[in-house]
A protein has these predicted regions:
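Bacterial N-terminal signal peptides that target proteins for export
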Residues: 1-11
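N-terminal signal peptide c-region/cleavage motif recognized by signal peptidases
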Residues: 17-20
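A residue-level detector for conformationally permissive "hinge/kink" positions
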Residues: 7, 70-73, 128
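N-terminal secretory signal peptides
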Residues: 23-93
Length: 179
């Protein structure tokens, strides 16, 4: 009986930490934060029914063949930082003019970065990532994890691994303003 108790105790000690470990992204806190980031994007006029339409440009995977970038400083939960919203458009033979004339028809997803407080993820310049569907719901990866937070941190592919390669070291490809 004592050996059986020791085996059960050892098994519990090894497995309980696995279940209590936080997911690297897409956890409840990330989902709550993603909703706040989406609301800030609406309030900024970047997404939603009355969204600003800027001049789209030709893009590339994984975001889309036509992209639109909008950004400004916003405050979320007392943290002020850059909000970078990328609208990702797709469609067969899509052109910039197609998107200008009917952006809602071609919008496939919206990817957002928000620079969080110092220490949120210092190794990755404190960026929060979210990938949203056009209706504001979070997109999911093939494993069903919601794409919000430190998306794919430590993975060979995904938001963070790609953005580490951005020139200037600020995790933004279009410019180097957020060093």
């Amino acid at each position: 009986m004592k050996i059986q108790t020791k085996i059960i105790s050892a098994f519990a000690m090894l497995t309980i930490p696995l279940f209590s470990m936080a997911a690297p992204f897409g956890n409840d806190t990330d989902i709550t934060d993603a909703a706040k980031v989406w609301k800030a994007s609406i309030d900024a006029g970047f997404v939603g029914d009355n969204a600003i339409v800027s001049r789209p440009y030709t893009g590339a995977p994984p975001h889309g063949m036509i992209l639109e970038l909008l950004e400004k400083n916003v405050t979320i939960d007392g943290v002020t930082g850059p909000l970078v919203v990328k609208k990702n458009y797709g469609g067969n033979g899509l052109t910039v003019n197609d998107v200008i004339n009917d952006p809602k028809k071609y919008l496939k997803s919206v990817t957002i970065q928000f620079k969080r407080e110092a220490g949120y993820d210092a190794e990755n310049k404190d960026w929060f990532y979210g990938k949203y569907l056009p209706d504001g719901s979070l997109d999911k990866n093939p494993k069903g994890m919601k794409l919000a937070g430190r998306v794919a941190k430590g993975a060979p592919t995904g938001c963070i691994s790609c953005h580490t390669a951005a020139p200037g070291g600020d995790f933004i490809f279009n410019h180097d303003r957020y060093k």
